[in-house]
Amino acid sequence: MAKKEKLFKLTTVLALCSLAACGGGGGSAVNLETQPLTVTGIAATGAPMANATLQIYGKDGAAVLATPATISTDGSYSATIPATATGPFVFEVDNGSEKVYSVLPSKSSTPVVNVTQISNLIAARLSSTGNPFNLASEIAAASTTVTSTAVTSATTSVMTALQPLATALSLNGTINPLNTTFTANGTGFDRMLDSLDVKIEPKGTKSQIEVTLKQSVNENQDLPQISFAHDATPAALPAVDATKLATSGLTPKIQLLLEKLTSCYADPLSTRITSGGTTAADIQSQNCKDAFIGGNPAGYKSGGMVVSKTQHFGGIFTTDAAAGVSFSDPKFFYSVGTTVANGPTSGDIVFGYRWKDEYGNFNIEKNVGRIDTDGKLKLIGNQYSYDIGVGAYSQRRNYVNQAASTFNSVGYTFGLSCYQLNQFQSAGNKIVKVNVTSPGGRKMTFIPNLSSGNCNYSYFVIAFGKDKTGTATVDGMGDPSFATGTGFVRLQSFYESGDTTATNHPRKLDKNIAFIGGFDGTDLTNEEIEAIPQFGTWTFEYYKTKTAGSTPVATQYFKTTARSLTVDGFKKSVKLPAITADLKTNLIANTSCANNSVYCYVKQATGPFVATWTKPTDPGLMPATYLARVYGMKDVSINSASWVGFEDSIKFGSSRATASIRCGQGESTVQPYCSGTSPSNANFGTNVSIDALDLVSRAPDGTDVSHFHTLKKLQ
């Protein structure tokens, strides 16, 4: 303990009073706990949490501010706790997509309270469940005690773990993250915030915490992190090289880039692009041009995608200025250490942000920028030539006609466009296989699922070395070649009912979806999932031939910004949209079944499929629903080779709760299961069935979650 005190000297700053006020002149002492208290501080996670709201909760768990305070553009705030409120107090800052917490033990404590990812970590250490979201209710229920001593102890343990970073930044050893004075400008203590990513996974009575050091790293390397249970003593970060950290003042540069994009979208559409323009060359607005490296949007490329009406930043060509699109909430992720051929350049900045509009739509995105000759950060993209992407993915697979079979899965989904990589490419340029290696070295193969050269699914699907019957299936290179119908690899799956019987595991009963290890493998344990790095590197190798001995035409890398949750963590921390009761009733009433009543579906009318859903009630925890996807078949004859599986989807703003999905939505040609003369007027053809509706949402950490409603049955 003496060593910790020497390192940090974490002291409570006591309110000083005059002799008269303290009784030296015969007067009575003032009881601060019965007085109003004005509290100030900074709310920032590196960048200011501008325009977020602040609420304070007292000892009884009730909100003490009649009207939530608003965080200023520089992250500062001021709020007055009324005389009637009693501590300890929990501070909650909500920007509409994430909530961050801090604490004040009592009114006699320092009237400065910062709300940052470090204070959120301290709040987690104080919580009996390790979940900052629960802290106020735990205090009210007396299951958690928050005193000055407890706060000091939690702060000391956190700052001891972070000491290597503080030392590298030459920060004063006496710094207290809860009440230190700082400016959210990417320097000093704020640079420390820029360098830290904190993930807290609630799991009932416990929470798992992972702290990642964000810095310069090679494309084929993971970012360093520490992991610990919320009530365990955390290990210290590894030694930190200050030259690898985010450069001083980087976050404001990201913010300036986002402001330039906001100005771009605010320009009238008529002056933003040439009339009818669809490509980067048609962009006329100087605000738009200035957001890209060299003032040239045509220089941008990310996973083979360029700036155009149908690819990246398509809103430049379509969104009216009245929509009020704005870009905010910059987050530095890491910088590229070493240049990669046909990829990013050393020093490129990988960052995240949120866009939103006046209609309540928002989403979380990630991109790559580069410092231009004028010293400003500009968009450049990752410069890779082939589509790439992988993200943690969680799904509730809801069996509409068989509720007892509903199960939850967690794992990863992969962004490999079948159209971009295969169908739309000329002969000789088609990618026929992508081998993917996980951060832990596990290898997976993805291939297109085709019918007559057309993609049955918009993405490459996972391939296995055995088919559903157990027959070995390999290609000319000895790689797996049985094409599933999914790009989602499940690491862990449990029934919603709690049934964990191995013989009843979903992998034994539904062999059309992909589980880690194939049809006869086993799930990963919680400990194995928690060992996966949050910012883990996945390697993608692209092949144009399946000939034995062939080499990949390209090798590319992709880092996640969050690892897969465990099933327990998914259930405890994510709220999902769900189809409306009317739609569910209609689907059940019109269900037909085949193949021993296992394959169930509804006949689709020639018009669009209309999906309707309800949203979770708490927008601060609610992922942004942005995609609806239907799955189905043409010519339903399960034991016949004539049927054609398909998948259609539509993206939309997160404020929506309904979507009409057309046949071949977004395709450039009329698909085999559609009727019509062009994609714009295509309808579902005759004898088409729909068997599933998927509602996909994006969580605040940029990962996707799915509520998949299927009409099929497991048995």
PLM segments and residue spans:
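C-terminal motif of bacterial Sec signal peptides marking the signal peptidase cleavage site
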Residues: 18-21
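Feature for extracytoplasmic/surface-facing segments of secreted or surface-associated proteins
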Residues: 26-366, 373-384
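Low-complexity, Pro/Ser/Thr- and charge-rich linker/hinge segments at domain boundaries
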Residues: 112-118, 390-399, 556-594
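Signal that preferentially marks extracellular ectodomain short beta-strand elements
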Residues: 334-340, 475-533, 658-686
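Short beta-strand edge/turn micro-motifs at domain boundaries
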Residues: 355-407, 414, 706-709
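Conserved aromatic anchor
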Residues: 412-423, 602-621
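Solvent-exposed loop/turn segments flanking beta-strands in beta-repeat/beta-sandwich domains
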Residues: 420-486, 616-651, 687-690
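Beta-strand-rich modules
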Residues: 540-542, 683-704
